C-alpha cells in the first residue's frame, strides 16, 4: 500500500510514514499489538487516529546478531540462543565477501556465470565466475528530485506510538523514494527527528549501487545513511568492498571507514586497496583514499598516503597510476602522471619523470576538441645530470621538446593541418622517452603546416614542411618552403573525354653542416672521414653532409605542370582507357662555388650531370590501360563460389629525356612488385620520369563466396620491354645495370588465401628469369579467431635483394642488396642493405587463464637476432600479470656510421595490471608487444 506525501511533507515527512504504517494493518490479515492506531488524514490536514484492539505481534524475523523480541513473554532459551549469535565482522573476511550473509554471495547481487543471460555474458569477463546484476525494481531509473518524490513503504507488520511519534515495522520492510530504496527485517521511524533505524539484513540501493549491513541509520528527508559492518557493490563497474561503517551522503557519495576497494569476485582476495578513509563519488566516477595499502592475498605490498582512482570509465582530475622501470640510459625511472579534466572538450596531463641518472624531466600535454578542430600542445624540459654525451658534438645539457598537432576546418571546404615538433638536440629520443600522443621517434621530426581547399572538381594545398634532425647518421633532408599544389579535373566531358591537371610550385632548401664532429669521448668521429690542419694533424671528424657532391648540394625552385586527357570506356565485361599526359618542369637552382667545381669534375662520369642554374624538362607520357572481366559460378568442397578471371594489359611509352643535370629533391626509385607493372613512372617523385616502352600483362583470379567473402586471390604478371631504361638515379649507369637492359621484367606474383575469417595467408614473390633467382619475396601467415582473439600466431619471412640505397660514405646510389661502404673501409659491411629475415610471434592460451608470449625475429644475412622475447601472461577476472624476457637491437648515435650504432640490449619486464585500477608496473610492455605482434591491439581492445 502506498500513499503520496501531503503538502506539508518537507516539515513533517514522517507523518506520512506514520499514517501509512498505521493504515497498513487494515489491508493485511496480521494481528497487531495493543497501542496501535488507525490513522487518517483529517479535513484540517492533521491526523485522525483511533486505537485498535490489543493483540500480540508475531515474532520478528531473526537475523545475525539480533535477538528475537516481542511485546509478549518468550521462552528464555530462545532469547539466550539469539543473543549468543554474534555477527561476523567484515574485517574478519580478509577481503572476501561475507559468507555468513549468504553462502553464494547473493546478498551482493552476485549471479553465477551459468545463470547469466546471453546479453549479461557478453558484458562479463571470460575468466569471471559471475557478475553483479542489479535486480529489477520499481523506481530504479527514477530521476525525479527527492524533494519532489513520494515515499512508499511496505511491511508485513506495523505499529505506531502516537505520543512518542515512533513507527515500528517488521517483516520484509521496504522503503522507496525516487531511485533510492532501503530494505531491512525491521525498522523504527522517528517522526520528530526525520530519522529511521534499520535492523537486520539491511540493504540500501540507489543508482546502480548497493550497500549491505547489519544496522543502519537513515535520514528520511535527505537520504543520508550510515550502515554498520557494511559491504558495498557498484554493479556496472564490477566494484565491491567493505567497511566498519559506510556513510551515504545526500548526493549519493559513499564514505567508508577502514574500508576496502577491489574488482575481484566476492570469493577472491587477489588484491584490494585498504584505507582509513575511502570516498566513492558516482557523480564524478572517481574515488579517493588516504593511508592506503595495496594488499595481495591480504598481505600489504605497497603503501601510499593518498590515491585517486576511477570507479567507472569517466574522466576526472587526479593522479594516474604511477609506473617505474630501469634502463642503462636513465637508471631507475619513476613516472607519476597527473591528469587535469579541465572541461568536456579539453584536458591536460602532467608527466613528472624522475630518472636516477639524469634528474627530473617535466613533461606535459594539453588536448583540445572543438566543433571544427582537434589537436594537442606538448612540451618537456630536463636539466640533464648525465655526463655521457657532454663531449659529443650537438649535445645540449638543457634538453627540451615542444610539439603541436592540429587538424581543423575553417569551413566545409577549407581544412588546416599542423604537425610541429622541435627538440633540443639530435639525441633526445635516443636518451629520453616521451608519453605524448602522436610524437614518433624517427630520424627526422616534422615541422609542417598545411592549408587545404576542396572545390567541386579540384583541390588546392599550401604546405610548409621542414624537418628537425633526430640523428647524426643521416644526411640533412630538404625542406619545402613553401609548396603549392593545384590538382583537379575539368567539369565538362565532350565525347566522354576526361581532362585533368596536376600543378606544383615548391622551393627546396637545406642547410648542410660542415663543422667538425667529435664522439662522446671528445675524440674526432672518423666514421665519415677526418679533417686535418696545415701540418697534417687530425683536428676533427667530417660531417656526413660532406659526402654530398656537386649538384646534390644545390637548393632550388621547381615548377611542374602535368595536363592530361583520357577516354575511359567501361562496360560490365571490361574497360579500355587510352591516356596522354604532358609533363613540363622548370628548375631554378642555386649552387655555391664548391658544388659547381665538384659538378664540373663529376661531369666526366656518364652517371652524373653538369650544373645549370635553369633547367626545362618536357616529357610526354602515353599509356593504354585495358582489362576484361570473366566470372562463373562453381563449387569446391561443397561450397558455392563465384570464380573470376581478370586479365589486364597495359602499354606505356615515355621517350628518353636526359635528366642527369637535375638534383634529387624528393625522388627515389620504387620497389618492383605486381602493382608497379601498371604505373606510368617507375620513380616516386617529380625529379625523375623514367623512359619506358613496355607492355605489361597481368591476370587476377578470385574465389568469392555467396556472402561476399573473398576466399582466395591470385595475381601474376610480367612486363616486356622494347628498349633499355636509360634514366637512372645519380651514380648509376644503365649500361652497368643488368635489369635496365633486360627485355623482360621479373615475374611478379601475389597470393592471398583465407582459410576462414580466422586464418589468413599473404605472399608476394618476384622471380628474375635472366638471373634465374629471386629478386624479392615475402610470406605471412596470421591466425586470430574472431570468437577468441586471445589466440594469435604470426609467421613471416621476407627476402629482398633489389633495394636501391644511398651510401652516405661514398655519396652514391647503389643497386641491389648493397654493401655499406667499400672493401677496405673500417666500417665496411657486405650486403648490409640485403634483407633476409624471419619473424615468428605467438600468444597462446595453454591452460585457462595462462598464456605464453613469444617473438623471434632473425636476420639470416648477418646471422643475428634482431629481437627475441619469451614469457607468460596470467589473466584473471580482476588482475593480469605479464613476465617477459626480451633481447633487442637498440640504436644509439655514438658515431655517424649507422652499423656501429647498433647494439644488443636485454631486459626482464614485469607488468601488473589491476583491473579497475590500472597498471601498477610495466606499462612499457604494452608498447613493444603492440609494435612487435600483429593482432595484439585487437586482442587488448576486445579483452575484458
Swiss-Prot record:
Supply the Pfam families for this chain: LptD, LptD_N
State the compartments where it is located. Answer: Cell outer membrane
Location of region: Disordered: 52-102
Report one GO cellular component: transporter complex
This protein's record includes keyword Flavoprotein:
no
Keywords associated with the record? Cell outer membrane, Membrane, Signal
Q: Does the keyword Nucleotidyltransferase apply?
A: no
Single Gene Ontology BP term?
Answer: lipopolysaccharide transport
Q: InterPro entries under this entry? A: LipoPS_assembly_LptD, LptD, LptD_C, OstA-like_N
**Signal sequence span per UniProt?**
1-33
Sequence ranges of Low complexity compositional bias: 64-82
Q: What does this protein do?
A: Together with LptE, is involved in the assembly of lipopolysaccharide (LPS) at the surface of the outer membrane.
Q: How does it assemble?
A: Component of the lipopolysaccharide transport and assembly complex. Interacts with LptE and LptA.
Family classification: Belongs to the LptD family.
What is the official name of this protein in its record?
LPS-assembly protein LptD
Species, as recorded: Pseudomonas entomophila (strain L48)
The primary gene name is: lptD
Amino acid at each position: 500500500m502506498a500513499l503520496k506525501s501531503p503538502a506539508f511533507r518537507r516539515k513533517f515527512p514522517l507523518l506520512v510514514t506514520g499514517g501509512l504504517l498505521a493504515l497498513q494493518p487494515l489491508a493485511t490479515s496480521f494481528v497487531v499489538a495493543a497501542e496501535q492506531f488507525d490513522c487518517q488524514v483529517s479535513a484540517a490536514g492533521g491526523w485522525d487516529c483511533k486505537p485498535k484492539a490489543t493483540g500480540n505481534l508475531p515474532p520478528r524475523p531473526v537475523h545475525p546478531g539480533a535477538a528475537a523480541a516481542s511485546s509478549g513473554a518468550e521462552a528464555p532459551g530462545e532469547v539466550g540462543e539469539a543473543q549468543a549469535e554474534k555477527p561476523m565482522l567484515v574485517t574478519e573476511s580478509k577481503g572476501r565477501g561475507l559468507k555468513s550473509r549468504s553462502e553464494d554471495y547473493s546478498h551482493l547481487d552476485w549471479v553465477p556465470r551459468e545463470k547469466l543471460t546471453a546479453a549479461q555474458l557478453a558484458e562479463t569477463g571470460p575468466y569471471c565466475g559471475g557478475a553483479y546484476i542489479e535486480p529489477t525494481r520499481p523506481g530504479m531509473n527514477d530521476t525525479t528530485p527527492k524533494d519532489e518524490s513520494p515515499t512508499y513503504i511496505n511491511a508485513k507488520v506495523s505499529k505506531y506510538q502516537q505520543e512518542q511519534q515512533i513507527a515500528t515495522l517488521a517483516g520484509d520492510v521496504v522503503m522507496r523514494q525516487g531511485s533510492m530504496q532501503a530494505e531491512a527485517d525491521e525498522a523504527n521511524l522517528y517522526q520528530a527527528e526525520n530519522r529511521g533505524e534499520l535492523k537486520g539484513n539491511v540493504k540500501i540501493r540507489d543508482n546502480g549501487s548497493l550497500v549491505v549491513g547489519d544496522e543502519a541509520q537513515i535520514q528520511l528527508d535527505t537520504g543520508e545513511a550510515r550502515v554498520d559492518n557494511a559491504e558495498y557493490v557498484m554493479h556496472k563497474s564490477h566494484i565491491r568492498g567493505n567497511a566498519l561503517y559506510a556513510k551515504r551522503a545526500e548526493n549519493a557519495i559513499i564514505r567508508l571507514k577502514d574500508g576496502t576497494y577491489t574488482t575481484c569476485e566476492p570469493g577472491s582476495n587477489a588484491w584490494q586497496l585498504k584505507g582509513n578513509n575511502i570516498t566513492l563519488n558516482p557523480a564524478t566516477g572517481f574515488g579517493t583514499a588516504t593511508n592506503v595499502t595495496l594488499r595481495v592475498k591480504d598481505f600489504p605490498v605497497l603503501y601510499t598516503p593518498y590515491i585517486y582512482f576511477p570507479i567507472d570509465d569517466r574522466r576526472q582530475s587526479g593522479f594516474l597510476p604511477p609506473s617505474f622501470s630501469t634502463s642503462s640510459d636513465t637508471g631507475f625511472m619513476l613516472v607519476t602522471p597527473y591528469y587535469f579534466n579541465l572541461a568536456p572538450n579539453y584536458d591536460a596531463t602532467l608527466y613528472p619523470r624522475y630518472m636516477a641518472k639524469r634528474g627530473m624531466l617535466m613533461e606535459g600535454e594539453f588536448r583540445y576538441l572543438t566543433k571544427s578542430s582537434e589537436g594537442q600542445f606538448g612540451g618537456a624540459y630536463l636539466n640533464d645530470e648525465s655526463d655521457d654525451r657532454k663531449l659529443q658534438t650537438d649535445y645540449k645539457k638543457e634538453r627540451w621538446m615542444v610539439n603541436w598537432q592540429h587538424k581543423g576546418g575553417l569551413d566545409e571546404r577549407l581544412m588546416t593541418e599542423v604537425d610541429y615538433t622541435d627538440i633540443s638536440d639530435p639525441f633526445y629520443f635516443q636518451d629520453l622517452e616521451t608519453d605524448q600522443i602522436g610524437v614518433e621517434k624517427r630520424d627526422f621530426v616534422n615541422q609542417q603546416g598545411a592549408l587545404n581547399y576542396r572545390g567541386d572538381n579540384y583541390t588546392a594545398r599550401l604546405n610548409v614542411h621542414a624537418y628537425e634532425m633526430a640523428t647524426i647518421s643521416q644526411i640533412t633532408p630538404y625542406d619545402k618552403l613553401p609548396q603549392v599544389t593545384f590538382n583537379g579535373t575539368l567539369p565538362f566531358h565532350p565525347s566522354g573525354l576526361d581532362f585533368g591537371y596536376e600543378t606544383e610550385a615548391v622551393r627546396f632548401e637545406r642547410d648542410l653542416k660542415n663543422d667538425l664532429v667529435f664522439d662522446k669521448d671528445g675524440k674526432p668521429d672518423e666514421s665519415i672521414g677526418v679533417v686535418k690542419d696545415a701540418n697534417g694533424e687530425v683536428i676533427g671528424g667530417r660531417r656526413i653532409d660532406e659526402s654530398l657532391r656537386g649538384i646534390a648540394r644545390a637548393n632550388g625552385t621547381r615548377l611542374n605542370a602535368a595536363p592530361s586527357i583520357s577516354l575511359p570506356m567501361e562496360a560490365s565485361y571490361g574497360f579500355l582507357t587510352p591516356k596522354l599526359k604532358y609533363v613540363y618542369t622548370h628548375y631554378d637552382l642555386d649552387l655555391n662555388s664548391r658544388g659547381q667545381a665538384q659538378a664540373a669534375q663529376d661531369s666526366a662520369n656518364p652517371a652524373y650531370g653538369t650544373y645549370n642554374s635553369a633547367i626545362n624538362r618536357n616529357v610526354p607520357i602515353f599509356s593504354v590501360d585495358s582489362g576484361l572481366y570473366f566470372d562463373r559460378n562453381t563449387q569446391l568442397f561443397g561450397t558455392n563460389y563465384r570464380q573470376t578471371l581478370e586479365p589486364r594489359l597495359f602499354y606505356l611509352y615515355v621517350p628518353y629525356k636526359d635528366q642527369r643535370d637535375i638534383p634529387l629533391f624528393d625522388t627515389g626509385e620504387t620497389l618492383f612488385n605486381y602493382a608497379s607493372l601498371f604505373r606510368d613512372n617507375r620513380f616516386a617523385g617529380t625529379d625523375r620520369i623514367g623512359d619506358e616502352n613496355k607492355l605489361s600483362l597481368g591476370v587476377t583470379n578470385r574465389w568469392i563466396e555467396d556472402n561476399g567473402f573473398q576466399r582466395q586471390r591470385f595475381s601474376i604478371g610480367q612486363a616486356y620491354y622494347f628498349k633499355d631504361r636509360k634514366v637512372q638515379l645519380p651514380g648509376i649507369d644503365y649500361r652497368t645495370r643488368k635489369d635496365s637492359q633486360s627485355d623482360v621484367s621479373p615475374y611478379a606474383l601475389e597470393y592471398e588465401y583465407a582459410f576462414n575469417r580466422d586464418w589468413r595467408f599473404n605472399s608476394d614473390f618476384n622471380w628474375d628469369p635472366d638471373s634465374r633467382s629471386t629478386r624479392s619475396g615475402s610470406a605471412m601467415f596470421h591466425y586470430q579467431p574472431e570468437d577468441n582473439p586471445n589466440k594469435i600466431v604470426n609467421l613471416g619471412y621476407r627476402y629482398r635483394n633489389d633495394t636501391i640505397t644511398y651510401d652516405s660514405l661514398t655519396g652514391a646510389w647503389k643497386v641491389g642488396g648493397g654493401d655499406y661502404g667499400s672493401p677496405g673501409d673500417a666500417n665496411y659491411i657486405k650486403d648490409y642493405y640485403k634483407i633476409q629475415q624471419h619473424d615468428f610471434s605467438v600468444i597462446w592460451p595453454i591452460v585457462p587463464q595462462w598464456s605464453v608470449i613469444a617473438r623471434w625475429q632473425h636476420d639470416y644475412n648477418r646471422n643475428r637476432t634482431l629481437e627475441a622475447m619469451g614469457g607468460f601472461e596470467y589473466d584473471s577476472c580482476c588482475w593480469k600479470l605479464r613476465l617477459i624476457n626480451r633481447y633487442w637491437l637498440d640504436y644509439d648515435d655514438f658515431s655517424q656510421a649507422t652499423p656501429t650504432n647498433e647494439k644488443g640490449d636485454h631486459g626482464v619486464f614485469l607488468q601488473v595490471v589491476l583491473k579497475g585500477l590500472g597498471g601498477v608496473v610495466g606499462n612499457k610492455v604494452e608498447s613493444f608487444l603492440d609494435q612487435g605482434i600483429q593482432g595484439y591491439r585487437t586482442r587488448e581492445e576486445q579483452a575484458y
